[in-house]
Structures are given as structure tokens and as C-alpha cells.
């Protein structure tokens, strides 16, 4: 999972993720937006599920983050889409709507994001 942190002209931090992990970048860009308390909540959530089979969820405006002791899933809060509505020969692209990664990798990303924000 590769990522890059950038600042736009307004100073807002932008996260760019490698292919297959785009939804994680969108989660940072849309739900975190530099608010370190969101990251603290997620880290607390990760600690709360450690050593258990429980899951922890944070529903945001655009994306929902779901984690367990091993994995993180970020999914867009879009309305369900039925393929019956598509015209023949068309397909629905949702690669940027759902991403999975290991919990340890995600927590490392959270730590690096926080460091980038603070420096």
C-alpha cells in the first residue's frame, strides 16, 4: 500500500493512495480533513477490538470505516446500485468505493498522516 501526502494551495493535506486503496485516501480527505481527534478515535477503536472478534465502526458523511483486530475496510456511503439499471455493455466502476488493508498498515498510515500534519 503506497501513499503520498501533499498540501493544496489552501494548506489542506491531501492523501493519494495506490490503486486498490483509493477509498482509504478519500476517507482521509473527506472524513479526517486534518482533524486529529478523528484519528485518535480510530486508534481507540483499534485498541477496543484487540484480542477479540468484535468490530468497530465509524460512519462519516461520505465514507464508513470498519475495523477488526486484523483488517480495515473503508466503504463509500453510496446508495446501493443495481446492475439491472445499466445499459447493455456497460459496467459499474466501484474500485474507488471500497478498500481493504491490514490494521497494522492502516495504523502506520494514521501515524504518518499525523506526523505530516504536525510538521
From Swiss-Prot:
Recorded superkingdom: Bacteria
Cystine connections: none
Record family assignment: Belongs to the UPF0231 family.
The protein, known as: UPF0231 protein ECA3777
Organism expressing this protein natively: Pectobacterium atrosepticum (strain SCRI 1043 / ATCC BAA-672)
